Curated annotation (Swiss-Prot):
The keyword Lipoprotein does not apply. This is Protein BIG GRAIN 1. Residues 77-140 are annotated as: Disordered. Disruption phenotype: Decreased sensitivity to auxin and N-1-naphthylphthalamic acid, an auxin transport inhibitor. Reduced plant height and decreased panicle length, and grain size and weight. Altered auxin transport. It is found in: Cell membrane. Mostly expressed in the vascular tissues of leaves, culms and young panicles, especially in hulls. Residues 90-106 have a biased composition (Low complexity). Its main location: membrane. Induction: Rapidly induced by auxin (IAA) and analogs, indole-3-butyric acid (IBA) and naphthylacetic acid (NAA). Expression level is gradually decreased as the panicle matures. The gene is BG1. Good candidate to improve plant biomass and grain productivity in various species. Transmembrane segments: none annotated.
């Protein structure tokens, strides 16, 4: 919306503005002159003057009422009806109809629209943050017990085992030993002797250690006795094993001799006959049904040996 241009104030308009809003004295004089013109031949001048004064007073009160009450309310209504931040000015016809509300006064009422005061709290405003509850020491213990009661899965057990292995490897660095500190402190021979004498650990409450000196013969004898003690159990074990093997072999021999279907008492005439070569052309006779022994017997029979197995 375009703003109307304010009319320029000239001398004639200034006089008209003064005439539109006359003072109380000028209004009173105008009323007196008017009454004198209307009643030139009557003798009631005092009554006419009082009536004129009352009319002038009434007009002045109306002007004061307009200036004190109606004018500010009109300006406020214009600001409220304005579409933009600035109020529009009124025309000259409106100024004349409202009893002298000129364009210059309308320019003075050109104010920025006031913002309404917010008296309610918006609903989207965040409320106060809730206070954090202090954790009780017993709560953590209960939580740990609850976790222990739960059945552990194989994967969790494996992970715990691996973590324990890696945690064991990451052992903290051991502090320097007392001997290293003593050696660093003993820089010279004199300080070394003094420090060693002063830093000897107390043997109170510890087991006593004895040192014995042995010659070479005694040492060799002691070592041989230790070796003999170590050898005795080995030899005893070997003897026990040999006896066990002999007993098992005897049991096997007894079982093989008792089996009548396994061995046969046959004689080999090829070994004792004078013409032993005559039996070599015949088929061999076996004394057992075992295939491995039969092969050995056949091989021996071909060479003229005895094929009897005892």
């Amino acid at each position: 919306m375009e703003r109307w241009a304010a009319p320029k104030v000239t001398a004639g308009s200034a006089r008209r503005y003064v005439a539109d809003q006359p003072s109380f004295s000028s209004t009173l004089l105008d009323a007196i002159y008017k009454s004198m013109d209307e009643q030139p031949g009557h003798g009631g001048g005092a009554t006419g003057v009082e009536a004129v004064a009352a009319a002038a007073k009434k007009q002045h009160e109306a002007a004061l009422h307009y200036g004190n009450y109606y004018k500010p309310s009109l300006a406020g209504s214009y600001r409220a009806r304005a579409p933009g931040p600035h109020a529009t000015t009124s025309s000259s016809s409106e100024c004349s109809s409202y009893g002298g509300f000129s364009s210059s006064e309308a320019e003075s009422s050109h104010h920025r629209r006031l913002r309404p005061i917010r008296t309610t709290v918006p609903g989207g405003a965040p409320g106060p943050a809730p206070e954090k509850k202090a954790k009780k020491p017993g709560a953590s213990i209960r939580a740990k017990l609850r976790d222990l009661r739960k059945p552990a899965s194989p994967g969790a057990r494996l992970a715990g085992f691996l973590n324990s292995i890696f945690a064991g490897k990451r052992a903290p660095a051991t502090p320097p030993s007392a001997t290293a500190g003593a050696e660093s402190a003993c820089s010279t021979a004199s300080s070394y002797s003094r420090s060693c004498l002063s830093k000897t650990p107390s043997t109170r409450g510890q087991a006593k250690r004895t040192v014995r000196f042995l010659d070479s013969d005694t040492e060799s004898l002691a070592s041989s006795t230790v070796v003999d003690r170590r050898r005795v159990p080995v030899e005893a074990v070997q003897q026990m094993l040999l006896q066990r093997m002999e007993m098992e072999s005897d049991e096997d021999d007894d079982e093989s001799s008792d089996a009548s279907s396994d061995l046969f008492e046959l004689e080999n005439f090829a070994a004792i006959a004078p013409a032993g070569a005559a039996y070599r052309d015949e088929l061999p006779v076996y004394e057992t049904t075992r295939v491995a022994l039969n092969r050995a017997i056949g091989h021996g029979y071909g060479h003229g040996r005895s094929a009897r197995v005892v």
